[in-house]
């Protein structure tokens, strides 16, 4: 294979080129995710996308967003692509608008729930789905300089198209039909992020009596002690305000967690169970099947089976849920973390849309979320521990660590069919995730502590 630099964007990155993780490319903004890198990423994405039309770019509120968008735009236009900049928006707005305007693809500059200093790039193709593994590999090959490229025949241009976001808000409102929230007291935690661009407006349009927390875009405070990763502010506000429910979003608003009037957490498993039950009763759930990941609670699975349903599990990542739903014609799927995908709403995780569905379904059926939660299922005790490990261990070394594997087998034998163990490497952070769940809390505590200690001892050895 011929190695050559692309003159318009500088030398190739060689072996130091980053790869795509479970949700695009992420890293510390300015260093791991530098403007120089984004210039090349933009260029190779522009060359890999095959459809005609502009490339859309949105971003969350992080302070580094404008810098990275500028670099990506430079790379894309160097690749001959026209760029339409959407500005601050929720991630699900990008795939929706790609399909609506016939774009060649789109990018979202966000690190989702990560700290403010991080940032990332999510990439979508012309169909609005995440860029395929094959095309991701082609971008990576280009970054390493392992492909010939004669360059484009033209230079693209960039225009501002924030006006398109009105179409996304209209889609949110139309998703609930004629259901309304007149006078319903609701609290929203917008976590200083993308949800500030639209969530409060659509809830107010539907008539909700709204209290908003962290409601302005703030790139230095996004996800800091708020939002879906820290629910205490929302729980306290819901109880103090006497609200019937509250919703917290992550940095780019593609996921959502709720709390009821008593401050109890309603996670993605509960949303799937509750929304799935409505669809099942309406005979609108093919095969009575829900799709979730290996992280979903065993109590959820057992309860759904008692309703006569089937729960299909996938690896972690909404792209895996999406693939399974498409393959099997499923109507609803998602992740415990709050990514919910509905076939009737474009199969794209959308935290604001999910919150609207949950709120209007409750109000339309004249049932409080707390009562609905009581009727759902009792989650098995579940504990997740993150063990910081070297990158080489995170990528593949942990799976061949015999002491850790033997400890996992011991834990599984101890709990039998009433428990589960899941050890997996994070796709976005330098950690190994150790999860244990069982009907017996003492077993959960015991085995989580033991497995985390084994991972730390053997994977962090000098």
Curated annotation (Swiss-Prot):
Mg(2+) binds at residues 112, 250, 252, 254. It catalyses: alpha-D-glucosamine 1-phosphate = D-glucosamine 6-phosphate. Keywords: Isomerase, Magnesium, Metal-binding, Phosphoprotein. Its cofactor is Mg(2+). Its EC number is 5.4.2.10. The modification Phosphoserine is found at residue 112. This is Phosphoglucosamine mutase. It comes from Parasynechococcus marenigrum (strain WH8102). The lineage of its organism: Bacteria, Bacillati, Cyanobacteriota, Cyanophyceae, Synechococcales.
């Amino acid at each position: 294979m011929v190695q050559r630099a692309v003159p318009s964007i500088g030398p190739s990155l060689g072996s130091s080129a980053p790869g795509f993780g479970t949700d695009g490319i992420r890293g510390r903004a300015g260093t791991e995710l530098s403007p120089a890198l984004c210039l090349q990423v933009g260029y190779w994405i522009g060359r890999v996308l095959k459809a005609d039309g502009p490339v859309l770019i949105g971003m969350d509120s992080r302070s580094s967003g404008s810098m990275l968008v500028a670099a990506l735009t430079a790379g894309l236009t160097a690749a001959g692509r026209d760029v339409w900049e959407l500005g601050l928006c929720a991630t699900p707005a990008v795939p929706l608008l790609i399909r609506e305007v016939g774009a060649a693809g789109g990018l979202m500059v966000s690190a989702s729930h990560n700290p403010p200093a991080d940032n990332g790039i999510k990439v979508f193709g012309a169909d609005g789905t995440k860029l395929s593994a094959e095309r991701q590999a082609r971008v990576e090959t280009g970054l390493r300089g392992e492909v010939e490229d004669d360059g484009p025949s033209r230079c693209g241009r960039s225009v501002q198209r924030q006006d398109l976001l009105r179409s996304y808000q209209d889609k949110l409102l139309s998703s609930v039909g004629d259901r309304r929230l007149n006078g319903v007291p609701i609290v929203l935690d917008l976590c200083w992020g993308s949800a500030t661009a639209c969530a409060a407006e659509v809830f107010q349009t539907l008539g909700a009596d709204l209290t908003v927390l962290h409601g302005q875009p703030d790139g230095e405070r996004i996800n800091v002690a708020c939002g879906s990763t820290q629910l205490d502010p929302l729980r306290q506000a819901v109880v103090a305000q006497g609200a019937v429910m509250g919703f917290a979003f992550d940095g780019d608003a593609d996921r959502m967690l709720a709390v009821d009037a008593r401050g109890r957490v309603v996670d993605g498993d509960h949303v799937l169970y509750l929304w799935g039950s409505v669809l099942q009763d309406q005979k609108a759930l093919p095969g009575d099947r829900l799709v979730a990941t290996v992280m979903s609670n065993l109590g959820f699975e057992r309860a759904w089976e008692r309703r006569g349903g089937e729960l299909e599990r996938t690896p972690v990542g909404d792209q895996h849920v999406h693939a399974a739903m498409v393959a099997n014609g499923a109507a609803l799927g998602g992740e415990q973390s709050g990514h919910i995908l509905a076939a009737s709403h474009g199969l794209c995780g959308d935290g604001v849309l999910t919150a609207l569905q949950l709120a209007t379904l409750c109000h339309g059926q004249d049932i409080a979320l707390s009562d609905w939660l009581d009727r759902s299922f009792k989650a098995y005790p579940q504990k997740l521990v993150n063990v910081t490990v070297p990158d080489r261990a995170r990528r593949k070394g942990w799976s061949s660590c015999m002491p850790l594997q033997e400890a996992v087998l011991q834990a599984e034998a101890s709990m039998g069919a009433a428990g589960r163990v899941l050890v997996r490497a994070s796709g976005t952070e330098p950690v190994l995730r150790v999860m244990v769940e069982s009907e017996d809390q003492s077993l959960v505590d015991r085995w989580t502590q033991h497995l985390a200690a084994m991972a730390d001892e053997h994977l962090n050895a000098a």
